[in-house]
Amino acid sequence: MPPKTRAAGAKKVRRKEKKNVAHGHAHIKSTFNNTIVSITDPSGNVISWASAGHVGFKGSRKSTPFAAQMAAENAARKAQEHGMRKVDVFVKGPGSGRETAIRSLQAAGLEVGAIQDVTPTPHNGCRPPKRRRV
């Protein structure tokens, strides 16, 4: 009897492993249109993530502080399943969901250590978009 082989189109599925990480980093990227929350271990491997669009908001509602709050709660809940208890927060971008996302990480049960703003500022690099005329 010949050895069993995989079907031509079948892929090898990597099972999601349960990491047990007590301390990590929460990266909050808050733009004018969306808020993305990624929770990583100290070396930068993503443990959980959520965004306002991923949580179920569409269009202009993605840019609201409430959408950022829901995204942060969702990411924190997933991270706590992996044993996360304490995070250092890195905030990037000018969006409206920055403070709300940090507050909801605390409310979800994660202990927030340091909060750092890592918004990139150009040393006169690219030309910015033109001013809106409404």
Curated annotation (Swiss-Prot):
NCBIfam families: PRK05309.1 (NF003698), uS11_bact (TIGR03632). One of its GO terms (biological process) is translation. Pfam families: Ribosomal_S11. PANTHER family: 40S RIBOSOMAL PROTEIN S14/30S RIBOSOMAL PROTEIN S11 (PTHR11759). SUPFAM superfamilies: Translational machinery components (SSF53137). One of its GO terms (cellular component) is ribosome. It comes from the Bacteria. Keywords: Ribonucleoprotein, Ribosomal protein, RNA-binding, rRNA-binding. Part of the 30S ribosomal subunit. Interacts with proteins S7 and S18. Binds to IF-3. Located on the platform of the 30S subunit, it bridges several disparate RNA helices of the 16S rRNA. Forms part of the Shine-Dalgarno cleft in the 70S ribosome. GO terms for molecular function: rRNA binding; structural constituent of ribosome. This is Small ribosomal subunit protein uS11. Belongs to the universal ribosomal protein uS11 family. It comes from Frankia casuarinae (strain DSM 45818 / CECT 9043 / HFP020203 / CcI3).
